[in-house]
């Protein structure tokens, strides 16, 4: 790799999850692309990479994000948060939210699951990770 790409890679390694999420959104807007398909591949690859590390402690690496309930007044905000977390269309996300308690996403890496939980809870939903 070139020195420039090495420098960019090192800068990316220092980003927090929130900063990385903001960067992805900015890249999507700037270049008119969607990271939804590639994000799923990264999420699915991460647990395998962590398991291959040979860690002695058995820490759960994949989680199911479960929408338990939501404040009726915050339904639209919760719907938007679920759409953002899952990449679903409006009708599919609405059906998912209205079926609560229901899994929003299954087999998600720990960090991504915690981010989804935080976003949905900030919107007014009650979420558990299993």
Swiss-Prot record:
Source organism: Synechococcus sp. (strain RCC307)
Function: Forms part of the ribosomal stalk which helps the ribosome interact with GTP-bound translation factors. Is thus essential for accurate translation.
Lineage: Bacteria, Bacillati, Cyanobacteriota, Cyanophyceae, Synechococcales
GO BP, one annotated term: translation
Pfam families: Ribosomal_L12, Ribosomal_L12_N
Subunit structure: Homodimer. Part of the ribosomal stalk of the 50S ribosomal subunit. Forms a multimeric L10(L12)X complex, where L10 forms an elongated spine to which 2 to 4 L12 dimers bind in a sequential fashion. Binds GTP-bound translation factors.
Example GO molecular function: structural constituent of ribosome
Annotated GO CC locations: cytosolic large ribosomal subunit
Protein name in the entry: Large ribosomal subunit protein bL12
Gene, per the UniProt record: rplL
